[in-house]
Amino acid sequence: EFMNLPGFFGTRAPLFMDIVSLIVAALPFLMLGIIFLARQKKYKLHALLQGILYIVSLIVLSFFEVGVRFVGGFKSFMQGSGVGHDYAFIVLIVHISIAVVTIIIWTTTLLMAKKQLENGKHKRAGWITFTGVTLIMLTGAWVYMLLFVY
């Protein structure tokens, strides 16, 4: 029942999708703040919050996946859209591809942080992860617009 409640953005999206979209929209800003903690040499706090953000993101992703499956997936979302199926599907595949690569890089960055710090690669890996999270937010908004606005 909860998964089918109407969202709060005033679109065709269900409530769970609006909740997830709001959280994903905040992710790059939260991550940027955590990155700046490292620049201020607050490394322990940086590591703690980065780990928490990662775990919360995985929980949100799981909530999203359950919700999508519960309401019928991409096909059910496409029923209300005025956008062509193939176009929306390609955008969705791009979004999913970016998300998968970003999660792999983020996981590796967290697990290999000490080693990356020693060889000077952690900072670069962090910025790549930040870029990926930002692209997830942007492509996710694109998918949301195609499925629930147009």
Q: Language-model segments: which ranges?
A:
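Alpha-helical membrane insertion/targeting regions
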Residues: 1-150
